[in-house]
């Protein structure tokens, strides 16, 4: 069975199990996850599990990428901030959904991973993704505000800069907690509302508003 067939089978299973919208299903079905993971893990690319990508980081399981996309209610033309680029896979899925009129700004604290993500995204023609090296807990103010924000590492609390960079009417998805983590949906309107989707497991967020500052 080739990678395309494995990807189709995974996408169909996630669609049925998670009741995915057509836009999220199509993005999962299209983005070649095997081209984002290290070569030694490519045979496992379409197993629904996280995989190591080096530097102590992982690529999220496909079901979690799909769930976060659904919770955000991503729409064509939106400007989205991603915290934690990793290998670029989640950004590619998001880019497929927001389309060429949209923009994904992704912040990665590990320069080597940022370079890997840039190469992966460029090789596949994703011109609507900008990868920045920096402290993700600070967001990226120069391109704010954002319609949607999502964080791929667990934070001690909602970082203040991310709330400030979220548009009024915008939505954020972020895991919060250390030993026990929960995935929260945060909505900014007149005030801030948040609700928990459920328990999750992510790597920790490091930075000024993370579990520890970045090393100088």
Curated annotation (Swiss-Prot):
Its EC number is 2.1.1.77. InterPro entries: PCMT, SAM-dependent_MTases_sf. Keywords: Cytoplasm, Methyltransferase, S-adenosyl-L-methionine, Transferase. One of its GO terms (molecular function) is protein-L-isoaspartate (D-aspartate) O-methyltransferase activity. It is found in: Cytoplasm. Its main location: cytoplasm. It catalyses: [protein]-L-isoaspartate + S-adenosyl-L-methionine = [protein]-L-isoaspartate alpha-methyl ester + S-adenosyl-L-homocysteine. The active site is at 60. Belongs to the methyltransferase superfamily. L-isoaspartyl/D-aspartyl protein methyltransferase family. PANTHER family: PROTEIN-L-ISOASPARTATE O-METHYLTRANSFERASE, PROTEIN-L-ISOASPARTATE(D-ASPARTATE) O-METHYLTRANSFERASE. This is Protein-L-isoaspartate O-methyltransferase 1.
């Amino acid at each position: 069975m080739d990678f395309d067939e494995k990807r189709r089978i995974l996408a169909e299973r996630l669609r049925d199990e998670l009741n995915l919208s057509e836009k999220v299903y199509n993005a999962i079905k299209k983005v070649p996850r095997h081209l984002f993971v290290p070569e030694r893990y490519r045979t496992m690319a379409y197993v629904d599990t996280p995989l190591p990508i080096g530097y102590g980081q992982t690529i999220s399981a496909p079901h979690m990428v799909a769930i976060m996309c659904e919770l955000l209610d991503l729409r064509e033309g939106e400007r989205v901030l991603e915290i934690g680029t990793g290998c670029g896979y989640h950004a590619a899925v998001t880019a497929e959904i927001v389309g060429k009129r949209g923009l994904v700004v992704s912040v990665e604290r590990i320069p080597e991973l940022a370079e890997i993500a840039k190469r992966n995204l460029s090789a596949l023609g994703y011109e609507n993704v900008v990868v920045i090296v920096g402290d993700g807990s600070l967001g990226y103010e120069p391109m704010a505000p954002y319609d949607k924000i999502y964080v791929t590492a667990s934070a001690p609390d909602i970082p203040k800069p991310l709330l400030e960079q979220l548009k009024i009417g915008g939505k954020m998805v972020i895991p919060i907690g250390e030993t026990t983590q929960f995935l929260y949906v945060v909505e900014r309107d007149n005030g801030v509302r948040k609700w928990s989707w459920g328990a999750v497991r992510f790597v920790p967020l490091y930075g000024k508003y993370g579990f520890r500052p970045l090393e100088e």
